[in-house]
Amino acid sequence: MLSPERLALPDYEYLAQRHVLTYMEDAVCQLLENREDISQYGIARFFTDYFNSVCQGTHILFREFSFIQATPHNRASFLRAFWRCFRTVGKNGDLLTMREYHCLLQLLCPDFPLELTQKAARIVLMDDAMDCLMSFSDFLFAFQIQFYYSEFLESVAAIYQDLLSGKNPNTVIVPTSSSGQHRQRPALGDAGMLDGVEASLFYQRLENLCDRHKYSCPPPALVKEILSNVQRLTFYGFLVALSKHHGINQALGALPDKGDLMHDPAMDEELERLLVQVPGLVNSITATSEASCLPSRTPPRVGSPWKPLHRSRKLDAESDGSTEETDESET
């Protein structure tokens, strides 16, 4: 059934808004790469399974980073997959380091960049050492903001630095790999770090930024709500407020509310069904559950609807032990 939004937009605008061309190009590439396997099932079934996986959000599993960040839907799907696969970390009350969370991210995306994980951890840890422990919920909501709004935050960081230095507010901000959050943060003793910038002026710049750029931004009304509650704030104070804001989490729509983060009955039922199908696995997990706080390096995975497409990627992901495994988390 077509949504009212679909009917209100011209065809070409709706296709562009939903990034349909991106998925068509990816589907055709996979069709060509796996044509021998697909020929025995049929092209029509392949496209049906591919777009069903896109709708279900499983199409991003074990894919390259350039693909999972290509569209807002891909980013939201990756966030949801990370939560569903590893929420047992939070359910067990385990605290992990930034490197350990990065290992988990690489199980779903082998080439996931360490830099993004570090930025998410910085939102939680602020000025603590990067090897400090973090709860799953704290890291997840910080990671959600950093990953989904990464381009927006690059420009926000550049605006913040310009306000601190008193630069012309009409300067156009172009996010690059060497700008924004990559800039050297002020020393702890600096007045700019302690006092931040004026919230009203900061909001004016952010409002213009949201109007000017097409990439995903938090709803301006919610950003205004955050900034209207303070007179001054720091950059990382702003990121913390974004990560903890209930309305922004709802607007993004990838994760449940914090109170429901550990509950996923559908996933629990599916995992139980999969575990029963593997002889001896349930007894093995029960016997070793107290000896290990981290989930297995090869946890049960939600299979792609089109198995030949992802078989090689799964093998690559399972053989890519690029980071060390932690046997026990600190308490």
UniProtKB/Swiss-Prot annotation:
- Cellular compartment(s): Cytoplasm, Cytoskeleton, Microtubule organizing center, Centrosome, Centriolar satellite; Cytoplasm, Cytoskeleton
GO CC, sorted alphabetically, is: centriolar satellite; cytoplasm; microtubule
Q: Where is this region: Required for interaction with PCM1?
A: 1-111
A GO term, aspect molecular function: protein-macromolecule adaptor activity
Acidic residues compositional bias, start-end: 318-331
Enumerate the UniProt keywords alphabetically: Cytoplasm, Cytoskeleton, Microtubule, Phosphoprotein
Region named Required for interaction with TPGS1, LRRC49, and TTLL1 = 1-225
- Offer one example of a GO biological process linked to this entry: regulation of protein complex stability
What is the superkingdom listed in this entry's lineage? Eukaryota
Q: Does the keyword ATP-binding apply?
A: no
Q: Which family does it belong to?
A: Belongs to the CSTPP1 family.
Reported function:
Regulator of the tubulin polyglutamylase complex (TPGC) that controls cytoskeletal organization, nuclear shape, and cilium disassembly by balancing microtubule and actin assembly. Regulates the assembly and stability of the TPGC and thereby modulates polyglutamylation of the microtubule, which antagonizes MAP4 binding.
Q: From the Swiss-Prot or TrEMBL record, give the protein name.
A: Centriolar satellite-associated tubulin polyglutamylase complex regulator 1
